[in-house]
């Protein structure tokens, strides 16, 4: 039987249940609570209180998301786009990417080693194939170019 979210307590409990599983951004949490039938005024009040109590934090969510996606092999371009689509502020996204402490060149090199066994492309077709894969994963074209020309990774 579905939970009815018609009281502040029910909305808060559901929000806390979602936050207990993983970090969420305010926009994402609002969307999930609306999908469950909570009225907007109860959602706003509950989320404001969670922010005041330090239980809901955009910066913690950004840090968690960037770290998770980087560990999954995705680069800064892709992560930035995913966060934009989730409705987060561009300045906050840029700050999170700057402060994450991730060496994107090293991550790119690790992904390339894992996928292509460290084999530099021998012809234009192979270079394009490797470049497409790495670009799709969200790495900047200048980094990819340096790596595939043999000048990246070990600078």
From Swiss-Prot:
Entry annotated with the keyword Cytoplasm: yes
UniProt superkingdom: Bacteria
Entry keyword annotation includes Cytoplasm: yes
GO CC, any one term: cytoplasm
GO biological process terms held by the UniProt record: regulation of DNA repair
Pfam families documented for this protein: RecX_HTH1, RecX_HTH2, RecX_HTH3
UniProt subcellular location: Cytoplasm
UniProt KW keywords: Cytoplasm
Family, as annotated: Belongs to the RecX family.
Job of this protein: Modulates RecA activity.
NCBIfam families from the UniProt entry: PRK00117.2-1
Name of the protein in question: Regulatory protein RecX
Organism, as annotated: Pseudomonas savastanoi pv. phaseolicola (strain 1448A / Race 6)
Upper lineage: Bacteria, Pseudomonadati, Pseudomonadota, Gammaproteobacteria, Pseudomonadales
């Amino acid at each position: 039987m579905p939970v009815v979210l018609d009281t502040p307590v029910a909305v808060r409990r559901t929000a806390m249940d979602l936050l207990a599983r993983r970090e969420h951004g305010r926009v994402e949490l609002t969307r999930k609570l609306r999908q469950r039938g909570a009225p907007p005024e109860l959602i706003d009040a509950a989320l404001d209180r969670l922010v005041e109590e330090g239980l809901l934090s955009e910066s913690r969510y950004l840090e968690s998301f960037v770290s998770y996606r980087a560990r999954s092999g995705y680069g800064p371009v892709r992560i930035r786009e995913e966060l934009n689509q989730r409705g987060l502020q561009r300045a906050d996204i840029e700050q999170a990417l700057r402060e994450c402490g991730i060496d994107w060149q090293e991550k790119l090199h690790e992904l390339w080693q894992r996928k292509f066994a460290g084999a530099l492309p021998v012809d234009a077709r192979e270079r394009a194939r490797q470049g497409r894969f790495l670009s799709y994963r969200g790495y900047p074209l200048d980094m990819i170019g340096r790596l595939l020309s043999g000048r990246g990774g070990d600078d």
